[in-house]
Amino acid sequence: YGVTDWTFVGTSEGSVSAFHAARMNPQLARRLILTSSVWGPTRNGPGLSDADWTALQATLLWVHHQDDPCEFTSYREARRYASRTRAPLVTVRGGGPEKGGACQAFTAHGFVGVERAVVRAMRSWVLTGAVPADVEAP
């Protein structure tokens, strides 16, 4: 297709796939955005706990809701990984109303009620390279 400027994005367990895709395709992946990321082991694998961050050439942005209710995707770990990788973390606050299980899309895990603002922040980073401000529900 002739596209040479790619941004890989992964959410929750998809963060693991996006990380490995970016790591394995450095000629394509200029940027990587990981949202509501799975840190530790689940029944599907090790999460990002065994990721080799030194092998990642893409510029990285973390996006995470401060009140993410999913047991595998704590905000505390998001802060730790952002520090460990020396990559910026956009913190999301507010939103709702929530419905469904803790690790489902219609909770803070999926940025319910603030989806557009979160996408605008990510898009701004892709287009400008400037780290966006934290996202707060109006």
Model-predicted segments: where are they?
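Stable alpha-helical elements in mature extracytoplasmic
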Residues: 14, 18, 49, 77, ...
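Alpha/beta-hydrolase fold nucleophile elbow
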Residues: 2-12
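Residue in the alpha/beta-hydrolase core beta-strand immediately N-terminal to the catalytic nucleophile
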Residues: 7, 31-33
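C-terminal catalytic histidine-bearing segment of alpha/beta-hydrolase fold enzymes
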Residues: 87-138
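Soluble non-cytosolic domains of exported or imported proteins
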Residues: 23, 69-72, 112-117
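The feature captures the conserved acid-bearing segment of alpha/beta-hydrolase catalytic domains
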Residues: 36-94
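Short glycine-enriched nucleophile-adjacent loop
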Residues: 15-26, 32
